[in-house]
């Protein structure tokens, strides 16, 4: 399903600096853009909107559609390939694809295995993808952490209890970071965790909780240098990661998730920070807000 803006709503693309500044770089009320990635050369953001893929030039502030073929409408799960030229994409048909950032034909990676595949991570060596599998597209079922080679083939399930989402490799490839409901019986109370990245001898391990909080915490993203991390925080009691509610985008040291360095209050949720949005030099990260006409976005 393609998301659209409500009457009186607009989308705002923000760039925050690790030194505390932030800048509204693009705002409009037409296409609902989501989930920024940052290109490897640092010149552009890559977002989805209206089922398509778009680039936003950070200097010129211009948006352009990436001309892709052989792929259905996209959702907001997409990750850049480590080579800087390719991108892995999740389609609304439940499959994962690879395409080039300059456009052209996309290639399907996953097969029809009775699951929807929601991509979130690519290993630093570019060989493996981490995704969430949901059986038969039944969103009442818990999401399972999975990996698959970028060339396709056999998938590897990771044994973590509870609903999981957002698996993303650490920059050194040693860990998978994600959110999970494994630590609580409270419905929807997602918390941040990590497990050792699977290799030929293991398929993960017991999840290590990064912190304990009363909020609902989703989508941990480490900076390329591994020193910092961002995530999105929903109010306590939130089930899933819905759109259009007050949320926080939080910056923390990667070694101490309990000590926020920055907290950005905004109206958003779904689409705000679904994928890794760090600049390649680890100095900035991007996110999207979706304020209504009555929402003040000039203050944190």
Where are these regions (language model features)?
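Sequence signature of WD/YWTD-type beta-propeller architectures
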Residues: 1-300
